[in-house]
Regions:
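Juxtamembrane intracellular "pre-TM" segments in multi-pass secondary transporters
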Residues: 1-5, 193-233
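Transmembrane alpha-helix termini and helix-breaking/packing motifs in multi-pass membrane transporters
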Residues: 30, 34, 146-174, 251-259, ...
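Cytoplasmic helix-loop-helix junction between adjacent transmembrane helices
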Residues: 101-142
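C-terminal transmembrane bundle of multi-pass solute transporters/carriers
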Residues: 43-47, 54-58, 62-65, 70-71, ...
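C-terminal ends and interior cores of transmembrane alpha-helices
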Residues: 78-92, 96, 305-318
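Hydrophobic core of transmembrane alpha-helices in multi-pass small-molecule transporters
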Residues: 15, 83, 94-110, 321-336
C-alpha cells in the first residue's frame, strides 16, 4: 500500500467517525432537558461522562497496545451503540447517568487507538510525504466531518423524517441516526482499516502481561523524557485554556448581543466558521513549519504565545464583529501547532506503548478541562468572563515557554526521537 492510499483510507474513516460524533453536538443539552433534567443534573451527567473517560483513558490505552488497536476501536463503536440505545430509552436521571458512563467509556476505549495504528503503518511505508503533512490532511477531514455532522444534527430534529410513537422527543432521531451510522461504520472500517494490514506490517514487540505495568511504564516515560515531559505539561494547560474559552464564549457573546435583535443563528454561524478556521490552520501548518526550518517546537512556541496575546484581546472586545474576528483568529493560532505537537508526541514514543501515551495525552486535556470548568467558572461568576480569559492567557503564555526546553535537534521535522 502507498502512503497516499493509506492517508486516503484513514482520512475517510476519521471523517466518518467524527461526523457521527457531530450529530449529537447541537442537541445534547436539549436532549437531556427532554428527559426532565435541570441544569444542575445536566452538570452532574456531564461530569460523570468526562470523569469516566478520564478514569479509563490510560488503562484502556494499554489494553489497545496489548490486544490490538483496530479491535479495540471496534469495541468502542459497540459501546457507543449500546450507550446511545440506552439513552434512547432513558426516562430518568439514573438511566441517563448510566448511558453517560457507557458513552464516556466508549470515548476512552477509542482514545489513541487508530491514531497509533496510523502512525505505525505510515512509518512502515516508504514515501516522500512527511507524517506532519499527512496529519494535516487528516485533520482537515476530521474538521469537515465534525462540521457536516453538526449541520445534519441541527437539521434532523426539525426535518420530521422519522417519528415513532415510543420516541420521547424530536431529538431522539439523532440517537437513531447515531446508532445506524455506527453500525455502518463498523462494516466500513473493516475495509478502510483492516486488521490484516496491521498484522502484516507492524513489528512484533514484547508485551507485558499486566496492563497496569504498561500504564506505569508510559507514565514514567512521559514525565522523564526530554520531549514528552514539556509536551504533557503544556497539554494540561491546553485543556484548561480550551475549556475556559469554549465554556464561556457563548455567555460572553450573549451579553454583547443583549441590545441587538439577533437570533441563535449567530452562534451557529460562528461555530461553523470555527470549524473552517481549524481546517485552514491544519492545512497551512505545513507551510508555516517551513518558516521555522522544520522546528516543531518553535512553531508551537510562537503560535501559542501569539494566541495568548489574542486571547487578551478577546477579553476586551465589545462588539459582535470584533468578537468574531478575534475569536476566530485565536483558534487559528491556538490550533496551528496541533499537528506539530502530535508529531513530537508520536516520534518520542516507543511503538508498543503508543496508544497508552496518546491516552495519557488525552487524559491531560480532560483533567485540565475539568479543572477549568470549576475554577474559571467560579472566576467568571465573581469577577467576569474577561478576567478568566486574561488569567487563561497568562497560563498559556507561561506554559508555552516549556517548549524552549526541548533540545533543538529533537524537534526537527522527520527526526526520530525514540
Amino acid at each position: 500500500m502507498t502512503q497516499s492510499a493509506l492517508i486516503y483510507r484513514f482520512a475517510t474513516q476519521q471523517a466518518l467517525h467524527w461526523s457521527i460524533t457531530g450529530l449529537i453536538v447541537p442537541v445534547l443539552i436539549l436532549l437531556f432537558q427532554t428527559r426532565g433534567l435541570n441544569l444542575t443534573e445536566i452538570g452532574i451527567v456531564m461530569a460523570l461522562w468526562i470523569g469516566t473517560t478520564a478514569l479509563l483513558e490510560v488503562p484502556l490505552g494499554s489494553f489497545a497496545d496489548q490486544f490490538g488497536r483496530v479491535r479495540t476501536y471496534r469495541l468502542s463503536l459497540l459501546m457507543t451503540i449500546l450507550g446511545a440505545a440506552l439513552m434512547l430509552q432513558a426516562s430518568n436521571l439514573i438511566l441517563v447517568m448510566v448511558s453517560a458512563v457507557l458513552l464516556g467509556a466508549a470515548r476512552a476505549i477509542y482514545s489513541g487507538t487508530l491514531d497509533a495504528w496510523f502512525y505505525d503503518q505510515f512509518q512502515s511505508i516508504e514515501g516522500e510525504a512527511s507524517y506532519h503533512s499527512a496529519l494535516a490532511k487528516i485533520n482537515i477531514m476530521v474538521t469537515f466531518g465534525l462540521a457536516l455532522g453538526s449541520l445534519i444534527g441541527g437539521w434532523l430534529p426539525d426535518s420530521g423524517l422519522v417519528h415513532f410513537s415510543w420516541m420521547q422527543s424530536i431529538y431522539d432521531i439523532n440517537l437513531l441516526v447515531i446508532i445506524t451510522a455506527s453500525i455502518a461504520l463498523l462494516i466500513v472500517t473493516q475495509w478502510l482499516v483492516p486488521i490484516e494490514l496491521s498484522k502484516v506490517q507492524s513489528k512484533p514487540e514484547p508485551r507485558p502481561s499486566n496492563l497496569l505495568t504498561k500504564g506505569r511504564q508510559a507514565l514514567r516515560l512521559s514525565w522523564h523524557h526530554s520531549v514528552l515531559k514539556p509536551v504533557m505539561q503544556t497539554t494540561l494547560v491546553l485543556g484548561m485554556v480550551l475549556s475556559c474559552v469554549e465554556n464561556l464564549w457563548q455567555p460572553y457573546l450573549s451579553e454583547l448581543l443583549s441590545e441587538r435583535d439577533s437570533g441563535t443563528q449567530v452562534f451557529g454561524l460562528i461555530s461553523a466558521l470555527y470549524f473552517l478556521m481549524a481546517a485552514q490552520s491544519s492545512w497551512l501548518s505545513v507551510r508555516v513549519l517551513s518558516w521555522f526550518s522544520g522546528s516543531h517546537r518553535m512553531l508551537i512556541l510562537v503560535s501559542r504565545v501569539a494566541s495568548a496575546g489574542v486571547l487578551f484581546g478577546l477579553a476586551l472586545t465589545t462588539q459582535l464583529e470584533s468578537f468574531a474576528i478575534v475569536y476566530l483568529l485565536f483558534f487559528f493560532l491556538f490550533t496551528l501547532g496541533e499537528n506539530s505537537q502530535s508529531v513530537l508526541l508520536q516520534d518520542s514514543t516507543p511503538s508498543d506503548m503508543r496508544s497508552t501515551m496518546l491516552s495519557i495525552s488525552s487524559l491531560m486535556v480532560t483533567v485540565g478541562g475539568m479543572g477549568a470548568s470549576l475554577g474559571f467558572g467560579y472566576l467568571a461568576d465573581h469577577f467576569g468572563i474577561g478576567v478568566s480569559w486574561c488569567i487563561a492567557a497568562i497560563l498559556l503564555m507561561a506554559s508555552s515557554m516549556l517548549f524552549a526546553l526541548i533540545p533543538a535537534e529533537k524537534a526537527k521535522r522527520g527526526h526520530s526521537l525514540v
